A protein has these predicted regions:
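Structural marker of alpha-solenoid helical repeat scaffolds
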Residues: 31-32, 65, 101-105, 140-142, ...
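Register position in tetratricopeptide repeats
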Residues: 2-5, 48, 82-84, 123, ...
Length: 258
């Protein structure tokens, strides 16, 4: 109660109603009866004070008790990621435990943890594992996703080398949001990797029709024309990309247009 009031009203000056007073009351309670619930609240207070290592230690007391929960493991992960020099693998391990605690009847709560785990897996370039988590997330929320979900999963599939899977996802994103030029540009990039340059050019045209100043698309158009041995068209596209401020166009002009 003391912590709830003190954290909600920063204008309080009564020393009996401060966060410090709440901590003192908790310490006394722990001395009398070392309950995990007290450590949970102590962890919450320390977290909000920015004392993340201490908060993590308190959350782990809860996690090593018989009242450990998905939430307590998740909060431990959130504290751990804020500790200087933390190990991403440790955070993923805590999220694994949070998800496992959700049991077989996983729901929207588990979906939040899975989404968090995806972000960390991507930072470690664990693309195959991230894709599996995207699939799990999709199932957990009953397929109720926005087009951007397919774009993000496509990025992971692209990096994992699953070009057909990536193409299927970006086309699902396009179907959901046909006026987003980035999706067509991404589709073009996949076609370039597949050496389907004519298909890539069609996707680029769709992107440019929506966003005429999309410099990267002109650069990609130039790359397609280089591969198709059409130097004049390639250089025209590279110069347009440079005109629009694309940072890579100048190098391509030097390589192909001199």
């Amino acid at each position: 109660l003391i912590y709830g009031v003190a954290s909600a009203d920063s204008t309080l000056t009564d020393p009996a109603w401060t966060i410090e007073a709440a901590m003192e009351a908790l310490d006394k309670a722990i001395e009398e009866d070392n309950l995990p619930a007290y450590h949970q609240l102590r962890a919450d207070i320390l977290f909000n004070k920015g004392e993340f290592q201490q908060a993590f230690d308190e959350y782990m007391i809860v996690n090593n008790s018989d009242v450990a929960s998905a939430s307590s493991y998740y909060l431990a992960a959130k504290a751990k990621e804020r500790v200087t020099g933390f190990n991403i693998g440790d955070v993923i391990d805590l999220l694994d435990k949070a998800i496992a605690k959700c049991g077989t009847n996983m729901n929207a709560e588990a979906a939040v943890y899975v989404l968090e785990r995806i972000n960390w897996r991507l930072r470690l370039a664990q693309y195959t594992e991230a894709i599996a988590d995207y699939d799990l997330y999709y199932t957990l929320i009953g397929g109720q996703v926005l087009p951007n979900f397919f774009f993000l999963r496509e990025q992971a599939k692209f990096r994992a080398g699953d070009l057909e899977g990536a193409l299927k996802d970006i086309q699902a994103a396009i179907q959901g949001s046909p006026s987003t030029p980035d999706y067509y540009a991404e589709e073009a990039s996949i076609y370039v990797r597949q050496q389907k340059y004519e298909d890539a050019l069609k996707s680029i045209e769709r992107a440019i029709a929506i966003a005429p100043d999309f410099g990267a698309c002109y650069r990609l158009r130039g790359v397609c024309y280089v591969r198709l041995k059409k130097k004049t068209e390639a250089c025209e596209a590279f110069n347009k990309a440079k005109e629009l401020g694309d940072p890579l166009a100048g190098k391509l002009i030097k390589e192909h247009c001199k």
